[in-house]
Regions:
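Extracellular glycoside hydrolase catalytic/binding regions
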Residues: 3-7, 12-191
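Aromatic-rich peripheral "rim/lid" segments of glycoside hydrolase catalytic domains that contact
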Residues: 169-257
Length: 257
């Protein structure tokens, strides 16, 4: 609690699970069931804030949420009719439940940060990555109802906790992953969404990193894609979140911005 470099607790990485294994499915409702991620997050936050009341509390989403007319007792899918009863999302990316049952931190509500994760078709060919997808089509089919509404309705601050992926021709020959990365990057710039990029190291098998060749080479192309989404002034100087200390040798402090 005395370490002032720790500003937030991300309570759990990527809660997930589907109804085909109910005991392992993270859900989001107003119950006190042991697999209710909302309730678990509120309990965990209470414990953390009792020790350090100054921290931000980051809460990720879940994987699935029941479609209209169904509840958490529905099976994952009716294979005879090919009917799906849940809205799917990336692990940690589904905040549909927060619309009716938002996280309640009591007197610490202003310290809540919702944190979705988002990835491209090289991680998994989700339905919204159909041929000809655009930023607008992903927004309509996935982003808005799963997490973007939280920003638009000013429910709580939003941090894109993970986004990233391959952009080289070997891994992304048709350019679809690069297209998704660009769509999300531009959305975050347009809406001033905070984010943390996944990842620096090269040994993340389905995304790669900002370095390669046994950590010896900086990926200039990938950095060039990410760089416009990093906070900088009109002269390209990166801006620190600290009012006193600049970020890096060529950056500026928040007070100097």
């Amino acid at each position: 609690k005395d370490n002032d470099t720790i500003v937030a607790f991300d309570l759990k990485n990527e809660p997930h699970g589907k109804a085909d294994v109910p005991s392992q499915m993270a859900k989001w409702d107003d119950s006190k069931d042991p697999n209710n991620w909302k309730y678990a997050a509120e309990c965990a936050a209470e414990k953390v804030l009792a020790i350090n009341p100054n921290l931000l509390i980051m809460v990720e989403g879940i994987e699935v949420y029941p479609k209209e007319g169904y509840d958490w007792t529905a099976p994952a899918k009716d294979w005879t009719t090919n009917t799906e009863f849940y809205y799917g999302a990336w692990w940690g990316g589904n905040f549909r439940g927060a619309k009716e049952n938002p996280i309640d931190l009591g007197e610490h509500q202003s310290q809540l940060v919702y944190s979705p994760h988002d990835y491209g078709p090289l991680v998994y060919e989700q339905s919204w990555f159909h041929e000809g997808f655009t930023q607008e089509s992903i927004m309509e089919e996935y982003w808005y109802d799963n997490w973007f509404y939280l920003l638009e309705e000013k429910t709580a601050p939003l941090l894109m906790g993970e986004w990233g992926g391959f952009i080289d021709e070997q891994h992304d020959p048709d350019g679809a992953n690069t297209k998704w990365l660009t769509c999300l990057r531009d959305l975050m710039i347009e809406n001033r969404i905070h984010h943390t990029f996944w990842c620096f190291n090269e040994n993340s098998g389905d995304t790669g990193g900002l370095v390669y060749d046994n950590f010896g080479t900086w990926d200039e192309d990938k950095y060039a894609l990410v760089k416009p989404a990093l906070w900088q002034d009109e002269n390209g100087k990166f801006i620190s979140l600290d009012h006193k200390f600049a970020i890096g040798a060529n950056g500026i402090s928040l007070s100097d911005y």
